[in-house]
Amino acid sequence: MNTPIGSRYPAFLRHTHWITFVLVLLAYITINARKFLERGSAERLFAVESHFLLGMLVLLITVPRIVVRLRHAAPPIVPEPGVASRLAAWTAHLALFVFLVVQPVLGIASRLLSGRGIGLPLTEWAIPSVGAAQPELAESLEHLHEFVGEAFYYVIGIHILAALWHWLGRRDNALQRML
C-alpha cells in the first residue's frame, strides 16, 4: 500500500527519524569517546557497552520505521525538484536505511561471533554468544563495521547538507516535511 498523506510525514516517521538521529549521534560519540578512556576502566566499558545498546536500539527502531515508510508515499516537495535531484535523494535515503540496518547487524554479529557476548551498560547482564567463537570472522566483520561507520560520516554529512540546501538554497519544503 502506498497511501498519500499531507504535506508532512506521519508523526511516527518524524519522531523515529529524530530519535534515530540522536541514537546514531550518541553511538558515534560513545565509540569515539572510548579512544580517550583508559583500557580496562569502568568508563571505557560504559562507553563501549553504551555503543552496543545504542546500535541495537537503532536497529529496533529502524525496522518498524521502514515498514511504516513503505506504506506511505513521501509528501511532495514543493516546488518539485528535477529528476536528477529526486534520483540522488532516493539513492541517499536508500543508503541511509541500509546503513541503519546493516551497521548494527555487523556490530552485533562481530561481537557475538567473537565469543564475548554483548554487555549491557550499568548492569551485569549480557547477551551471550551462541555457538563456538569464530574470531577470524568476528574480526573481519568488526573491520567492515568500522569501515562502514567511517564511510557514513560522509553520507550523513551529505544528508544534512542536502536538507540545509533545500531549506536555505531552494527554499522548498523538503526539510519541513520531517519537522
Where is each model-derived feature located?
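Membrane-embedded alpha-helical bundles that constitute the cytochrome b-like, heme-associated redox core
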Residues: 1-179
